[in-house]
Amino acid sequence: MRRAIVAFVLLVCCYTLGQQSNPPRQRVEKTPPATTPPAQTPTEQPPQTQEPRTARTPQTEQTPAQTTPQRTPESSEGAEGQQLRAMHFDMAEVPPVITHHSIRVAGRELRYTATAGRMPIKDAEGKIDAEMFYVAYTVDGSDPSSRPLTFSFNGGPGSASIWLHMGAMGPRKVVLQPQGWMPAAPYRLEDNPNTPLDKTDIVMVDAIGTGWSRPADTAAARRFWNMRGDIESFGEFIRMYLTRNERWSSPLYLFGESYGTTRSAGIAGYLADRGISFNGIVLLSTVLSFETLEFAKTNDVPFPLILPTFTWIAGYHHKLPSDLQGDVAKAAQEARDWAQGEYWAALNKGDAMSPQEHANVLDKLSRYTGLSKEIIEWANLRVDVRTFTHYLLADQKLHVGRLDGRYTGPDPNGFMDTPFYDPTSSQTGPPFTSVFNDYVRRELNYKTDMPYWTSAQQSGNFRWSWT
């Protein structure tokens, strides 16, 4: 199931960013079929028992000054000709906050230090153009010359690192309900027994314009809200962190997710030219070729690639035929083999397919996706993410999660065409945001009046350029 989730995150996260910043060719909307597919088995989700726990009181060494954003009335031209509202943020440099904690991982207790702060990113003249928020976790008593150090971030572009931070990498994580649904407030934290902190020190970094990372002004935002500027800002952050924390001799790693994998590739090349090389790079939900993500009339590449993921998710929701449902992993491999051969060849033929070939493809797609033949015919044998998530459980008036296909949310209109939304974001956003804001203030003792932007879109000013 992990491979399915990873693949689905790869596809949909970057499909979203592509639509936002570099939209593909216009798609002609079609009216979906009015009839409903045969009823299927109700959704089931495996239990994942988690117990909440109370927050701990850290040992505090420093407290940062309060940092309040300010805005000015000017405006400036943004990326790709779009208008950016004028903005200005206080770039006063404040010492980071240091607290001490412990956690039990893999049967042994780890004592570690958490450092939260904002790293200045300067221009060629030494002026601070931005500050990047980070939280570093370092195990006490280790030798920096041999202790691995991993820099980790989410993608977007325009996503904060909160999702990896509080869901996978950090020593503390958000408590969700066993079925993965959003729990009722107050939301809780618990120790993360799967944190890689026993293997490597971790630095979680927020991209400029996300989290508490801010550009100095509108001109600085234009400098960083593009691929080149984004890579340069992370490269400079890493150089500064190694310098200020005397970690130049440590084994270095990058851990990026979705667009963060593209960023990782860029950072590796950028820093190699400046004398910094990495021992390894971890790519989660990899996107290094954007053609694999662009669902468009003139691009058939994504459709065979996504099919095994659809099979995994359909199996999770018990939507596969009985002969496939018993072994979903085997079914996904069968779908992969068919997609790379017969399906790909059929798409290449297009209208040259014989009626029998068309019927065979229709049968197989229905078999591997759990969708009705009518829906697949309407989609012209090309099922994209929006079609799949909207129609898989439409007979139950449920919508499947986009970022995580295990999630579902109510869709009262059922088979009627409705605005697209993602139950995953709806159910994880509030717990993650609330818990993180409480965690950094109470356990890490980091104080600020600024809002934490989980997405740069929350700035109301985000314009991304792919140059």
Language model feature labels by segment:
Residues 17-91:
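Compositionally biased, proline/threonine/alanine/serine-rich low-complexity intrinsically disordered stretches
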Residues 48, 66-85, 126-225:
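N-terminal cap/lid subdomain of alpha/beta-hydrolase-fold enzymes
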Residues 90-141:
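N-terminal cap/lid segment of alpha/beta-hydrolase-fold proteins
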Residues 118, 174-249, 291-293, 299-323, ...:
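Active-site-proximal cap/loop segments of hydrolase catalytic domains
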Residues 171-176, 269-373:
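A catalytic-pocket lid/entrance helix-loop region that shapes and gates access to the active site
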Residues 246-259:
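Alpha/beta-hydrolase fold nucleophile elbow
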Residues 260-265:
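Catalytic nucleophile loop
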Residues 346-467:
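Alpha/beta-hydrolase fold catalytic core
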